């Protein structure tokens, strides 16, 4: 009798395991509904620049695509894979050298954001970032952490080279073309840095005091244009 109960419990457990929905492009709502609260929180946390100890999420990203910035956790029971995020914005940034591998993994150094905006040619920008997105795809990353689209407000900002211009309209239009090119490859972007992160103190500090009018007319306008015209996968 005990053996019968044990076999019955095993069969019920197997049925429950196989009854879990597996992620496809058509059943996202069903999979989200099946996630536990802990799984949802874990998925949102992602990895950072913390320890590289075995089992850490950053170590996991390094194992998937060496040199990638980070990854989300996979949820195997629902078929949710890790999402690999890699830095831009002037092309994919990964490690060219890998352990026990004689090959060198080169990425193209594309023009920085200020140069792209200086062309005043959104078609050319999209053509260029289509090639950039192809490298993201071929090297196994899922999301490029780009474009940077804060405004040029202070010449001492150390990240001005990443950003397009001092004008929100030019910034938004250039960003939209940039995004469309990258995402035409089936990989995503993360537009950054939302919002008003236009200059920093010693890289790690920021104190932005902005009026409502300036925020809407200047610092948010480029993001608005990019989101409406290009539908980026993520926002940083």
Label for each model-derived stretch:
Residues 1-22:
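Bacterial Sec-dependent N-terminal signal peptides
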